[in-house]
Amino acid sequence: MSRPLSDQEKRKQISVRGLAGVENVTELKKNFNRHLHFTLVKDRNVATPRDYYFALAHTVRDHLVGRWIRTQQHYYEKDPKRIYYLSLEFYMGRTLQNTMVNLALENACDEATYQLGLDMEELEEIEEDAGLGNGGLGRLAACFLDSMATLGLAAYGYGIRYEFGIFNQKICGGWQMEEADDWLRYGNPWEKARPEFTLPVHFYGRVEHTSQGAKWVDTQVVLAMPYDTPVPGYRNNVVNTMRLWSAKAPNDFNLKDFNVGGYIQAVLDRNLAENISRVLYPNDNFFEGKELRLKQEYFVVAATLQDIIRRFKSSKFGCRDPVRTNFDAFPDKVAIQLNDTHPSLAIPELMRVLVDLERLDWDKAWEVTVKTCAYTNHTVLPEALERWPVHLLETLLPRHLQIIYEINQRFLNRVAAAFPGDVDRLRRMSLVEEGAVKRINMAHLCIAGSHAVNGVARIHSEILKKTIFKDFYELEPHKFQNKTNGITPRRWLVLCNPGLAEIIAERIGEEYISDLDQLRKLLSYVDDEAFIRDVAKVKQENKLKFAAYLEREYKVHINPNSLFDVQVKRIHEYKRQLLNCLHVITLYNRIKKEPNKFVVPRTVMIGGKAAPGYHMAKMIIKLITAIGDVVNHDPVVGDRLRVIFLENYRVSLAEKVIPAADLSEQISTAGTEASGTGNMKFMLNGALTIGTMDGANVEMAEEAGEENFFIFGMRVEDVDRLDQRGYNAQEYYDRIPELRQIIEQLSSGFFSPKQPDLFKDIVNMLMHHDRFKVFADYEEYVKCQERVSALYKNPREWTRMVIRNIATSGKFSSDRTIAQYAREIWGVEPSRQRLPAPDEKIP
């Protein structure tokens, strides 16, 4: 497995991040051997590369456990306010390298594996991604956990341990096929099952009203078993916990209905209960009102709240005896953050526990609930908003429906008092939507039941106040805040782009890794020839490495000197991968028209998954691959234009492609992308952005200066005006010859000669019912892309612009985001203080 060292690798050994201590390396080798033999029960004659990965993982994990136990002891002794981040998704990716980075073990492990004749990078590639998320929302939760640990907050991530995460995407004949993601097949060395904290969760049943109050009876019980994963902060010896619940049937499941011969069936039917945590719903920005999904949402909430209350009541470390019974202090000790409306049932569930079980009166319980809960909104797309049918809630959670009705009644009384006589406002603001199917609007429930409501970028938060939540803002303006999203610089710079992290550290030191605003110091290097050269060199090395990866994995040849033009994100009409396609075809047609004219060579890479039931998104993937089939095999084009669909885009692939990108495509219709976080990752890794004034792009352009950003297209106001006037695609088709040619090519089967009408649905949508107005931005987009190519011809000026972008990306650290949540929503103060290491005395 060992190979000669490249110059870059030899240079790594004189890293400013310090050499591996000899005794450290010896110790790691000893522990590696111990785990190979005693944990995995293998010797070198029968060990596979996967065994070596597991041995290394266990060796690294050993360095976490002392810190993990210490951290939890510290929290029990200090009893700080706890932060509970509730999310149906945590898109964690791989854990090994991130743990080594945060614990400063990377060099020592690299040296130890090298001395054992192993290649650490090859071992890292064996780890499965923990793909427990769809896209941005789940990845944000993962970045937030990293930042909360790095800022020393007593924080816990709570979610579901899906047996199957986001599907693996295979492209067959240009079409997306889904494959189950059996990520736990070989076991997960990072989790620790905690069966002793298993808790019951109730479903169905009925409500009995007694003199003591309401009782929820005759329920079906499913057990929630927690699995804990350590979350290390950056070099501060803090290790927090992500606790994921797995569904288990109770031992007496269905056996009370026991009849002769029924026993076997009863045992087989245990699967029905355990299906709750079987699979992640693969929808991004789309609501699918299925009973199993509602069960998942209640399952995580019910188990988590029991855990929160148990921890609140027992103030001593490891003690399960109730101590605190007064809930007045609950909001001073507990903050619950709802990541979108998916965990919104936390509000009625907390009310149920306080009123029915803890016997608080309604007003006191409501005060506690509102002070405890806060809600983050992630989208304004109407099809993404959760509206659960009343009949489903009535069957599955009858007591919660009653509580929601009571919340609604009291809420509407407040609205009526504040706006007397405004009947339509009552209808608009009700948690209950009347119609053919009566529904509960979960966003309205969250706003009513939270003390803070935030959007995830400044423009998004403004849109919330002016449009979908306008009525609520007028009632309670103090609730509404903005918290612009961020990304963790540990994973998204130090881990994925060590070359860039290194040359930055050589100029400004290493403190920027936990204080990203320090990147501003790089502004004084914009004209430094050596730094310009270094930045360009690192980018070229990353491009060569990614080109080699594509060749190895997909047998795809690309020109590493071409401009790497990258759009990677979920496939969705609002993200406008189709606009990108129109540009690619424009470039192709121009080359065909003037084959001898110089063009800046481009490799256009598009990647992302389509929800399995989203027909248009799947057609878009087929179109991208079809364009590639034509463009990549046209001898006239040569290597001046290549179109690559990146199969199975996921966290571990993002870590490879983002550092190699020259151009980042962030081209959603203004007003549709709440924030975006991929945009920030590209900026931090030295790509330039072409984008609309949408989501966080607005703030990125503000930080970098608009002259260092390729901005095009309609602003939100322009989109609104166009809506009022009526968007007519035909106007653009008639006026723009290049656009007309493309649509004719799509209609005539130019890109699908065996099936001429293959793309008729796409053409029909673009021409007649395109909600996202692709044609309206086409001309400006193509012109803006010409400016991109022109700048790319001047490598020095391009790199200077890159440096300005990197230097102004500090705002987009999730450390900044979390510090704002902490101070402005949770009422806690972040801290960069180190805990003592396990081998240090506690002061």
UniProtKB/Swiss-Prot annotation:
Residue list for modification N6-(pyridoxal phosphate)lysine: K681
Cofactors required: pyridoxal 5'-phosphate
This protein's UniProt keywords: Acetylation, Allosteric enzyme, Carbohydrate metabolism, Glycogen metabolism, Glycosyltransferase, Nucleotide-binding, Phosphoprotein, Pyridoxal phosphate, Transferase
Phosphoserine modified-residue sites: S15, S430, S514, S747, S748
Catalytic activity entry: [(1->4)-alpha-D-glucosyl](n) + phosphate = [(1->4)-alpha-D-glucosyl](n-1) + alpha-D-glucose 1-phosphate
Keyword hit for Amino-acid biosynthesis: no
Positions annotated to bind AMP: D43, Y76, R310, R311, F312, K313, S314, S315, K316, F317, G318, C319
Swiss-Prot/TrEMBL site (Can be labeled by an AMP analog) positions: Y156
GO cellular component: skeletal muscle myofibril
Annotated positions of the N-acetylserine modification: S2
Activity regulation (record text): Allosterically regulated through the non-covalent binding of metabolites, being activated by AMP and inhibited by ATP, ADP, and glucose-6-phosphate. The activity is also controlled by post-translational modifications including phosphorylation.
CDD domains with a match to the protein in the record: GT35_Glycogen_Phosphorylase
Keyword Transport: no
Family statement: Belongs to the glycogen phosphorylase family.
Binding partners and assembly: Homodimer. Homotetramer; to form the enzymatically active phosphorylase A.
Protein name (record): Glycogen phosphorylase, muscle form
Gene behind the chain: PYGM
